[in-house]
């Protein structure tokens, strides 16, 4: 019986990952003309950041509306200046469900050109467009309920059930994290390209960050796999 429930647990988790949303091809001339990044821009300048956002955000929001997977496509982009030594960007939701993308000032310092900043922004917007937060929460809840249920069914104590729930939730939330990153790279590539930036050049940011390798239940795929996804996506649209 426990084996049967375990198989059901695995099947439900496997079914919880949605495919990459189909993105309508946007003629680049209707989006933004190409930007030639000199690499000499002050990427920590809010003026530069506003210029990037002014190009990327409308494209991301248009793709968000076209894919129709999430209801709120009104993005808000912020820069966190309190973390100068942290290189990070992430997407979350405000209390009202509005998608929020936050850059650390450390990431802007680490970037070498506007293509890299635009690519990171497109990638983070893509997480929302693909509904990754909702999928991760669903997988976490499902993993917790089923693994906790397994322990309860086998006569485990309340403490053991709680521990199993936490473990199941942690595993469930990570099952498709690598796929989510690759999906975001693919959609983010299109956003970056249609905004007039060079996503291939932008993805070179991956060559300067630690490579997570191909760890089981790791949160990110190998950097080489991410760069390959960008290149293959661009081969379809060029």
Regions found by a protein language model. Give the residues of each.
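C-terminal motif of bacterial Sec signal peptides marking the signal peptidase cleavage site
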Residues: 13-16
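Peri-catalytic and regulatory segments of divalent metal-dependent proteins
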Residues: 19-139, 195, 215-217, 237
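Sec-dependent signal peptide recognition
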Residues: 2-8
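Solvent-exposed, polar/charged alpha-helical surfaces in well-ordered, non-transmembrane soluble domains
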Residues: 47-54, 58, 101, 105, ...
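Metalloprotease/metallohydrolase-associated module, dominated by Zn2+-dependent proteases
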Residues: 155-202
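Post-HEXXH active-site segment of zinc metalloproteases
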Residues: 132-163
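Long, well-structured alpha-helical subdomains associated
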Residues: 177, 195-238
